[in-house]
Amino acid sequence: MTPSERANRLYVRVMQYAESGKADSVTRFAPMVLAAHQMLQTPSIDERYHYGRVAEVVGAPEIVKAQADTILGLRAGSLLGLVLAARAERLEKNDSAARVFDKRLLQSLERELATQNPDYANHREEIDQAVADARLRKI
């Protein structure tokens, strides 16, 4: 198994635990996921998103923010980067900054989806939820 495959499998496991409310399992496995992602030599945008999402689940906004910043530095309109950036700001109770990222998400949505980026297909539910939430906030 490659380091990337290992990191991805651990990510899937921890996110399943988080969605099932198994906090003890999240606490047990999250450090392994974070370590596996730190060992990736050239992480993809998708892998950076995974790293940020697990950091979000364990309440590490500085990691979430760093991954979002890196993703957006690589691709300014990245839906994954914008979703992650808004979540990072909300973790830090900075709703006004989160709304800025929500607005950018809505502005970038159609253009980015038109690229048919496979990462967007893999995380479509999360993107759709972030878009729905942003629209409810009446950005």
Can you describe what each PLM-predicted range is?
Residues 6, 63, 126:
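Soluble or luminal CAZymes and related metallo-dependent hydrolases
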Residues 1-10, 37-43:
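TPR-adjacent "capping" and linker segments in tetratricopeptide-repeat scaffold/adaptor proteins
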Residues 12, 50, 84, 130-133, ...:
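"A position-specific structural signal for the A-helix of alpha-solenoid helical repeats
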Residues 15-75, 84-88, 104-110, 118:
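Alpha-helical adaptor scaffolds
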Residues 92-95:
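Exposed beta-sheet edge and beta->alpha loop/turn motif
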